[in-house]
Amino acid sequence: MRRPHTLLATLLLAAGTAAAQDYGQAATLKIWDNTTAPHSNGIATPEREPEPNRIADVSQAVLYIFPADPAKATGQAVVICPGGGYVKLCIDYEGYDMAKWFAANGITAAVLKYRMPNGHPEVPLEDVEQALRIMMGLEAGATGFTAGKVGIVGSSAGGHLAASASTLARTKPAFSILFYPVITAEKGKAHQGSFNALLGDKRSAETDTWYSLQNRVSSETPPTLLLLSDDDRVVPPVNSTLYYNALKDNGVKASMHIYPTGGHGWGIRKNFKYREQWQQTVLDWLQGIAK
């Protein structure tokens, strides 16, 4: 009997060949739920959409995998963590739409619908670490990417999760791309709602320090690209600068691009003035680290 990951790799190969001009969703993989995962977030209510393309009360982790255009395959892949303040997921412009763009440019992209922490910070971290293990375990070659080139992308609170995978997880990505990420819990600098949702009644000075990820950077943190706007009033730009400085202090390759306007949460939206610029920046940076 074939292993599940082998079957998934076969599906990806077939989908990537058949849909080279479509880059549509190729495969859906249910990772686990609160009854089968190592930890539960305690959410017993059904998953819901409080508004279109916003998913709340997530209690089952799922990967939605979009295969790279085989004619452009770079050998790289990404796990994408949408934002939403750790209470919901902005699954379109920070998830599916972004994944399709990566796939069209030769990078297999897997959108992670991760479980909301609901005061259990270990829950989304174990989801993203398992997602990375799954992607790294797919058969090299057949899927258009290799295990050593699986990176992570995250936006806002999803950026905090991506940075957590890069600093706290045992299975780390090969690289990380962070869009206007939540990084620090420091007073006056933090997006407090994200940390309240992440830590719940466990929140303390000690947990704030631990989950302020500029404090967790080491020489083992992967190369990182940060993209943000100077006028972000939701997640202050200092979150990114703190992380960037910590990366450089630890000898980690890093690049940061700060756009003058755009605010917060632009993702791959077409109305973001610097959309084409960030897209070219990402492709150039990925090409550079692949050498």
Predicted regions and their residues:
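Short beta-strand element of the alpha/beta-hydrolase
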Residues: T74-G83
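Primarily recognizes the serine-hydrolase "nucleophile elbow" in alpha/beta-hydrolase
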Residues: Q130-S194, L198, D208-T209, L213
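Conserved alpha/beta-hydrolase "acid-adjacent" motif
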Residues: R233-L242
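C-terminal catalytic histidine-bearing segment of alpha/beta-hydrolase fold enzymes
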Residues: T241-K291
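N-terminal cap/lid segment of alpha/beta-hydrolase-fold proteins
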Residues: Q21-K72
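Active-site nucleophile elbow and catalytic-triad environment of alpha/beta-hydrolase enzymes
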Residues: A61, D201-R216, T221-P222
